[in-house]
C-alpha cells in the first residue's frame, strides 16, 4: 500500500481520529516541510494530516463535531459519561491522570469530576502533554473552568511531544501510577506496526507503573462510516481541501491551491478496516517541490482513520507487551485499559488474594469432583511459575499443585492425567508461604525480561478462568451453608442474606461495559431492564406469573414458546410462555480465528480459522430461559422425575446426584425456593427474571419438555452475527455462558499448543460440550467471540444459561 503516517515524534492527530486532542504545531518550520516533501515523493502521494489544522481548519473541525453524521466525537463522549465511575474505579488512589494531546478538555473533565467525587479535589492531579503552548494554555483554562474545585497546583502542563512529555511526567512523579489517557481514537492515524512501536515507546518512556486508557473507534457498516467523513453539508470536504491549500502554501505554490482544483473522495477500505480521505487533481500542478508534479487525475491521500475490531485491539496490546485489563464499549466506540503484563499479573494476584481472604476454611470441598479450595491457591502459583519460567527448577510442591481434576461425571474413576492426590493437603500457612516465594521468583523473571508476552498471557488467562470457576465453588459453599443454617433455624431469614442486587449490578456492569443492549438500546441485566427487579409470585417462592423487561405482566402458562396459545408440544404438556421467537435467516459463518502466535494470543482450540460454512435458517428465543420458567418445569411439573425428557446417561447421573433442581437452588420442604450465588442467597421470587444456570443435560431436558432444542455452536455464531446491530437476541454473549449442543472437538487443522498441549486435547472426549459468551464473573480479557469454553454436559455447577431453539418449519 502506502506509507501515509508521519513519524511518531512529529505525530499530529487528525479528524479521522476525532480531534479531541491536538498535537498541533506550526508546520512551516524546516523539519515539517521536509516531512511534507517526503510525503509528496511517495506513490501514491500523501499530505501529513497536521496540515489540516491551521486556524481555518481548526474552526472547520469544530463544525464537524457538531454534525449529525459525525458520530465519533459524540460516541466517545457518551461512552465516558456512561462509564466514568467504572473507569475511575480502575484508577488507583494517588495516580496522576496524564492526557496525550490537549483540546477543549470537555471529555477529560468527565473523568476528572468522577475522580474528584471519589477522592476529593485535593487528591486529584492532572498533567497535560502537547507540543502546542497555545493548546496547553487553552486546556489549562478549560480544566480550571470545568473543574473549579481543582487548585492550580493540581494542574500541570508539559510542552513536548508525547514520548518526551511522558519522560518528563515520570521524572516529576517517579513513583506514582501514571494513568495515560489517549482520547479521540488518535491511534487510528497510525498503521498497525506504527501503533505497536508507539506503545512500546510509551512503556519505555513512562515505565512499568503505567496504565493506558485507549479510545478506539470500532469498525462498522460502510454507510455509517462514509456519511461520517462525507457529510451532506460538505464541511468535511472543505476541511480536507483547506488542508491541501495549507500544504501547497507551505511549499510555495499557493497560487495553485484553489479548492475548486480538487475533487474529494472518501474510500472505505474493508481489507485494512480504515476510512481514506483523498483529493483528486482536476488539473496539473507543476513544480510542487524538488521537480515533483501533481498530474491531472492523480490521487493524493490527505488522511486515514483506522477502525478497530476487538481482535485488532487485543493484537495491538499483545504485540506491545500490554494486557487488556478492562474494556468499556458501546455499539460504536470502545475504551480499553492497557497495563504491562507484569502489572497485569500483580493485579490478578490481588484479585486472587481477595477471593481467598474471604474463604474461611480452605479445606472445604463444596464440589466433590473438584479439589478443596486450598489446592487452587497453590495451583495458580504453580501453573504461573511453570509457564512463565518453563526452564526453571521444579520443586515437589510445584508438581503437586501443577494440575487439577475434571473426572468423568458418569464414572469419576476415569480422569485425565494429574498428580497423585496426597493423603493430606499442606496446611494453609504452608501454601501461603509457597505462593509468596513463587510470586517473588516470577516477578524477578519479569524484571529480567525473560518472561515472554505469550507465556504471561497463558498464565493470566488461566488464573482468570480459575477465579471464575472458584466462584462456582463459592456458590456451592453458600448453598451448603444456607441449608445447614436453615436446618438449624426456624427463622431462615435471620440467618442468611437475601440481597441479589450485587449480582445484578455485576451483570449489568459487564453487559453495559461490553455494549449489550435491548432493542430499545437500554442496558439489560439477565432479562431485567435497567437493573430493576420485578418480584411477583406467592410468598413461598412459587411463581404464579412474571413481569417481562417491558413491564408487561403475564401468567406463566398464558401462552407458549412456539407462539401458538392453542397448541401443545409433542409430549402433551403445555409449552411455556416466553419472549418471541426470532427467525435467523440462513447464511455463512466462519468458526475459529487465524492467529500468528508471535502477533496475538488465542488458545489452541480457537484456531485456525475455518472455511466459511452454511447454516440453515432456524428460530431462537429472544432471551434465555428464566428462573421462573425453569421453576415451572423443575418444581411444578416435576420434570426431574419424568424419564422421557432425559437421555439415559444423563438420567443415571441425575439419580446418583439425588438433586431434583439446579445445583444453585434450594427447594425446601415448605415450598420455599432459594437461588445461591457466591456469598449471598435470594428468594427465587426476587430473581425470577434472571436466566437460570444449569447443566447441558438439564437444558436439554427442559427443551425436550418444551418442544425445542439447544442450539449448536454454528447456530450461536450465526445468531450473534445476525443480531450484531439490531440486538434482537438478548443476553446472548453475557449474563451467563450459553450452552451449545456441539461436542468440544478440534477445529480442522488444529495443532496443540506446545506450552500447554493438554489444555484442549484431554477434553476432546465426547463428554465435554462447547459453551460460548461469558458470565458476570468472566474477566474482560476472556470475552471474545472466538473463545471456546467447555464443560461436561452433566456438570451442573457452571454459570451457563440456554434458550429454546427450533428448526424453521
What are these regions (language model features)?
Residues 46-88:
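Class I SAM-dependent methyltransferase Rossmann-like catalytic core
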Residues 205-219:
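Conserved beta-strand signature within the Rossmann-like core of class I S-adenosyl-L-methionine
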Residues 218, 224-306, 314-320:
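Substrate-binding/catalytic lobe of Class I Rossmann-like enzymes that use SAM or dcSAM, i.e.
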Residues 341-371, 378-379, 390-395, 399, ...:
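Disulfide-stabilized, aromatic/cysteine-rich ligand-recognition loop
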Residues 361-410, 447-499, 618, 632, ...:
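Short, contiguous alpha-helical
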Residues 376, 385, 573-701:
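A short glycine-rich, aromatic-capped structural motif
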Residues 584, 620, 641, 691-692, ...:
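Conserved hydrophobic ligand-interaction patch in extracellular adhesion modules
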Residues 606-611, 636-660, 733-809:
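Surface-exposed recognition segments
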Amino acid at each position: 500500500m502506502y506509507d501515509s503516517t508521519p513519524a511518531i515524534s512529529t505525530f499530529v492527530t487528525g479528524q479521522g481520529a476525532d480531534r479531541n486532542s491536538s498535537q498541533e504545531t506550526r508546520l512551516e518550520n524546516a523539519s515539517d516541510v521536509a516531512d511534507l516533501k517526503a510525503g509528496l515523493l511517495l506513490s501514491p502521494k500523501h499530505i501529513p494530516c497536521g496540515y489540516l489544522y491551521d486556524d481555518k481548519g481548526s474552526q472547520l473541525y469544530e463544525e464537524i463535531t457538531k454534525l449529525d453524521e459525525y458520530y465519533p466525537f459524540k460516541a466517545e463522549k457518551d461512552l465516558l459519561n456512561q462509564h466514568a465511575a467504572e473507569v475511575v474505579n480502575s484508577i488507583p488512589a494517588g495516580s496522576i491522570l496524564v492526557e496525550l494531546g490537549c483540546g477543549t478538555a470537555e471529555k477529560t473533565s468527565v473523568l476528572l469530576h468522577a475522580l474528584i467525587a471519589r477522592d476529593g479535589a485535593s487528591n486529584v492531579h492532572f498533567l497535560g502533554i502537547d507540543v502546542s503552548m497555545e493548546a496547553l494554555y487553552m486546556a489549562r483554562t478549560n480544566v480550571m473552568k470545568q473543574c473549579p474545585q481543582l487548585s492550580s497546583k493540581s494542574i500541570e502542563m508539559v510542552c513536548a511531544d508525547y514520548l518526551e512529555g511522558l519522560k518528563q511526567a515520570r521524572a516529576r512523579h517517579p513513583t506514582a501510577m501514571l494513568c495515560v489517557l489517549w482520547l479521540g481514537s488518535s491511534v487510528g492515524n497510525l498503521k498497525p506496526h506504527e501503533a505497536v512501536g508507539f506503545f512500546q515507546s510509551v512503556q519505555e518512556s513512562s515505565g512499568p507503573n503505567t496504565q493506558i486508557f485507549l479510545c478506539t473507534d470500532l469498525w462498522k457498516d460502510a454507510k455509517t462510516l462514509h456519511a461520517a467523513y462525507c457529510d451532506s453539508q460538505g464541511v468535511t470536504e472543505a476541511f480536507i481541501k483547506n488542508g491541501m491549500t495549507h500544504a501547497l502554501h507551505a511549499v510555495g505554490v499557493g497560487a495553485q491551491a484553489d479548492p475548486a482544483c480538487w475533487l474529494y473522495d472518501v474510500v472505505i477500505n474493508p481489507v485494512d478496516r480504515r476510512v481514506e480521505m483523498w483529493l483528486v487533481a482536476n488539473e496539473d500542478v507543476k513544480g510542487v517541490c524538488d521537480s515533483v508534479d501533481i498530474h491531472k487525475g492523480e490521487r493524493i491521500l490527505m488522511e486515514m482513520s483506522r477502525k478497530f475490531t476487538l481482535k485488532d485491539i487485543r493484537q495491538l496490546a499483545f504485540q506491545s507487551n500490554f494486557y487488556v485489563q478492562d474494556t468499556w464499549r458501546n455499539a460504536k466506540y470502545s475504551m480499553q485499559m492497557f497495563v504491562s503484563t507484569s502489572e497485569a499479573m500483580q493485579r490478578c494476584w490481588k484479585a486472587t488474594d481477595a477471593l481467598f481472604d474471604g474463604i474461611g476454611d480452605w479445606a472445604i470441598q463444596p464440589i466433590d469432583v473438584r479439589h478443596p479450595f486450598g489446592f487452587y491457591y497453590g495451583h495458580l502459583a504453580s501453573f504461573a511459575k511453570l509457564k512463565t519460567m518453563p526452564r526453571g527448577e521444579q520443586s515437589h510442591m510445584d508438581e503437586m499443585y501443577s494440575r487439577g481434576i475434571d473426572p468423568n461425571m458418569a464414572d469419576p474413576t476415569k480422569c485425565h492425567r494429574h498428580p497423585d492426590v496426597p493423603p493430606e493437603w499442606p496446611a494453609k500457612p504452608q501454601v501461603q508461604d509457597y505462593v509468596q516465594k513463587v510470586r517473588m521468583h516470577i516477578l524477578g523473571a519479569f524484571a529480567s525480561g525473560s518472561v515472554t508476552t505469550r507465556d504471561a498471557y497463558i498464565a493470566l488467562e488461566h488464573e482468570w478462568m480459575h477465579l471464575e470457576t472458584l466462584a462456582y465453588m463459592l456458590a456451592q459453599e453458600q448453598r451448603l451453608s444456607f441449608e445447614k443454617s436453615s436446618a438449624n433455624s426456624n427463622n431462615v431469614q435471620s440467618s442468611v442474606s437475601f440481597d441479589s442486587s450485587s449480582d445484578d449490578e455485576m451483570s449489568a456492569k459487564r453487559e453495559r461495559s461490553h455494549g449489550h443492549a435491548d432493542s430499545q438500546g437500554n442496558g439489560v441485566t439477565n432479562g431485567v431492564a435497567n437493573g430493576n427487579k420485578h418480584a411477583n409470585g406467592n410468598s413461598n417462592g412459587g411463581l404464579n406469573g412474571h413481569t417481562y423487561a417491558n413491564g408487561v405482566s403475564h401468567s406463566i402458562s398464558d401462552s407458549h414458546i412456539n407462539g401458538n396459545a392453542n397448541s401443545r408440544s409433542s409430549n402433551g404438556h403445555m409449552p411455556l410462555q416466553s419472549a418471541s421467537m426470532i427467525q435467523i435467516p440462513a447464511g455463512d459463518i466462519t468458526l475459529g480465528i487465524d492467529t500468528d502466535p508471535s502477533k496475538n494470543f488465542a488458545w489452541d482450540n480457537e484456531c485456525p480459522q475455518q472455511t466459511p460454512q452454511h447454516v440453515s435458517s432456524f428460530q431462537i428465543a429472544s432471551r434465555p430461559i428464566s428462573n421462573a420458567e425453569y421453576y415451572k418445569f423443575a418444581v411444578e411439573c416435576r420434570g426431574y422425575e419424568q424419564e422421557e425428557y432425559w437421555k439415559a446417561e444423563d438420567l443415571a447421573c441425575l439419580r446418583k446426584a439425588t438433586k431434583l433442581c439446579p445445583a444453585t437452588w434450594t427447594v425446601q420442604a415448605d415450598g420455599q425456593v432459594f437461588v445461591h450465588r457466591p456469598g449471598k442467597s435470594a428468594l427465587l421470587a426476587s430473581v425470577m427474571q434472571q436466566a437460570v444456570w444449569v447443566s447441558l443435560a438439564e437444558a436439554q431436558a427442559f427443551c425436550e419438555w418444551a418442544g425445542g432444542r439447544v442450539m449448536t455452536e454454528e447456530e450461536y455464531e450465526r445468531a450473534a452475527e445476525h443480531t450484531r446491530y439490531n440486538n434482537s437476541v438478548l443476553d446472548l454473549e453475557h449474563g451467563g455462558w450459553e450452552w451449545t449442543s456441539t461436542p468440544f472437538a478440534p477445529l480442522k487443522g488444529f495443532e496443540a499448543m506446545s506450552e500447554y498441549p493438554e489444555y484442549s486435547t484431554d477434553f476432546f472426549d465426547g463428554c465435554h460440550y462447547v459453551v460460548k459468551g461469558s458470565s458476570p464473573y468472566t474477566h474482560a480479557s476472556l470475552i471474545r467471540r472466538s473463545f471456546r469454553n467447555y464443560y461436561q454436559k452433566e456438570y451442573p455447577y457452571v454459570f451457563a444459561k440456554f434458550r429454546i431453539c427450533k428448526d424453521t418449519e
